[in-house]
């Protein structure tokens, strides 16, 4: 039988369930697929299939993640659900599962718990801008006033971390009831309402091709008589012959150049798109003026920096990380896009040391400038092995 072609007819959005352990994230994920499967818009997954998520390796870090996909009337969704709290921390910091928006699951019976807060904080740090709330286990609460109280608490918590808590959609229901009675219109109504809110509230993300052009440089060589070629994979945007671009990073100054040719697999292109592996011929650039680790970018779109705050997950010994803690002034390599740059770290006040398995905010000062913006991912390496993974949360200078 021929493979089914992926029909890209609906806009695609990446989402995930977040929230405290045992508040019902996985049950809700199963309920969504089961109910949409009735309409032919998903493959139904049961709780066990999602819960036994396979291990994945992302930048050397082991993460358990379940991926399901489904459709609503308007959209195609890829949805991630993680069995363990540590998996969420790793997922969100490494960017293994990029989320355009999240469904925060809170038990109406328990209210917000420590991981509820931690996941909201992580979402705000790593650039997940949109959260829709599902107040689960509502069937276990007899007093409607209690549900109102929990709703108020959740809104306050969202406000505290910079989300618009007062305007955030909150849907009340029971994921288990919906999962057990997929033909009962009343039981499944909260799930349908939730998906309608997700459709309406989480905007369709900007496609990579619509963003400003950026290509991390992987290699540089000279073609006699024609000039210097920089190769790499276009991360975002488009590039046409004749475009002016900037060479950013590894130096204090930014150089402007004109692209006189674009090639892919030795074929000449008029233009390159996000995802293409290309060689860009640059006019008037000497071989020694450009190096791996820099980026080619649309003029004015990105700047070089060497001091920033990052949220970092430190690998455990079992993940191939350090066996011992590190302290203030630790000087590892920070791997951005295509290159390692040495940097020193400053821990937050009152933090003496960082243990393998911790996640923490740290201020980093690099010895050379790197082209960076908020939410840029990096790895921390020692002698070529990854010992941590991080995301830039704010730039200092």
Swiss-Prot record:
EC number: 3.6.5.3
GO CC annotation, single: cytosol
Superkingdom classification of source: Bacteria
Localization per Swiss-Prot or TrEMBL: Cytoplasm
Region spans: G1: 19-26
Annotated GO MF terms: GTP binding; GTPase activity; translation elongation factor activity
Chain spans, region G4: 136-139
InterPro entries: EF-Tu_GTP-bd, EF-Tu_GTPase, EFTu-like_2, EFTU_2, G_TR_CS, P-loop_NTPase, Small_GTP-bd, T_Tr_GTP-bd_dom
Enzyme class: hydrolase
Predominant place of localization: cytoplasm
Assigned keywords, A-Z: Cytoplasm, Elongation factor, GTP-binding, Hydrolase, Magnesium, Metal-binding, Nucleotide-binding, Protein biosynthesis
Domain tr-type G: 10-206
Positions that bind GTP: 19-26, 81-85, 136-139
Reaction(s) the record says it catalyses: GTP + H2O = GDP + phosphate + H(+)
Record region (G3): 81-84
Pfam families assigned: GTP_EFTU, GTP_EFTU_D2, GTP_EFTU_D3
Positions of region (G5): 174-176
Region (G2): 60-64
Signal sequence bounds: none
Residues that hold Mg(2+) according to the record: 26
Similarity field: Belongs to the TRAFAC class translation factor GTPase superfamily. Classic translation factor GTPase family. EF-Tu/EF-1A subfamily.
Subunit annotation: Monomer.
Role according to the record: GTP hydrolase that promotes the GTP-dependent binding of aminoacyl-tRNA to the A-site of ribosomes during protein biosynthesis.
Annotated protein name in UniProt: Elongation factor Tu
Species per Swiss-Prot/TrEMBL record: Clostridium acetobutylicum (strain ATCC 824 / DSM 792 / JCM 1419 / IAM 19013 / LMG 5710 / NBRC 13948 / NRRL B-527 / VKM B-1787 / 2291 / W)
């Amino acid at each position: 039988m021929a493979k089914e072609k992926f029909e890209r007819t609906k806009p695609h959005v990446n989402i995930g369930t977040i929230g405290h352990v045992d508040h019902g994230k996985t049950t809700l994920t199963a309920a969504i697929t089961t109910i949409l499967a009735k309409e032919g818009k998903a493959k139904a997954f049961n709780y066990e299939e999602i819960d036994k998520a396979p291990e994945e390796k992302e930048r050397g870090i082991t993460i358990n993640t379940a991926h399901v996909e489904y459709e609503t009337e308007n959209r195609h969704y890829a949805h991630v659900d993680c069995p363990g709290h540590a998996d969420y921390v790793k997922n969100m910091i490494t960017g293994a599962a990029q989320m355009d928006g999240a469904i925060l699951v809170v038990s109406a019976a328990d209210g917000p718990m420590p991981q509820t807060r931690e996941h909201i904080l992580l979402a705000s740090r790593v650039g997940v801008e949109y959260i829709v709330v599902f107040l689960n286990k509502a069937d276990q609460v007899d007093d409607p006033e209690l549900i109102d109280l929990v709703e108020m608490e959740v809104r306050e918590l969202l406000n505290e971390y910079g989300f618009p808590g007062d305007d955030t959609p909150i849907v009340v229901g029971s994921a288990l009831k919906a999962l057990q009675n997929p033909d009962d219109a009343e039981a499944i109504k909260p799930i349908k309402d939730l998906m309608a809110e997700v459709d309406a509230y989480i905007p369709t993300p900007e496609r990579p091709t619509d963003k400003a052009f950026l290509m991390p440089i992987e290699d540089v060589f000279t073609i006699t008589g024609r000039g210097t070629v920089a190769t790499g994979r276009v991360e975002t945007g488009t590039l046409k012959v004749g475009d002016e671009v900037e060479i950013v990073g590894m130096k204090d100054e930014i150089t402007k150049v004109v692209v006189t040719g674009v090639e892919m697999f030795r074929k000449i292109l008029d233009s390159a798109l996000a995802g293409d592996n290309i060689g860009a011929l640059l006019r008037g650039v000497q071989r020694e003026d450009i190096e791996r680790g820099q980026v080619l970018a649309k003029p004015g779109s990105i700047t070089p920096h060497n001091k920033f705050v990052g949220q970092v997950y430190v690998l455990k010994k079992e993940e191939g990380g350090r066996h011992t803690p590190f302290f203030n002034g630790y000087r590892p390599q920070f791997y951005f896009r295509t290159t390692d740059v040495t940097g020193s770290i400053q821990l937050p006040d009152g933090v003496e040391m960082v243990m393998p398995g911790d996640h923490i905010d740290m201020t980093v000062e690099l010895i050379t400038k790197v082209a960076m913006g908020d939410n840029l991912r990096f790895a921390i390496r020692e002698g070529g092995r990854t010992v941590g993974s991080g995301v830039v949360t704010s730039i200092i200078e």
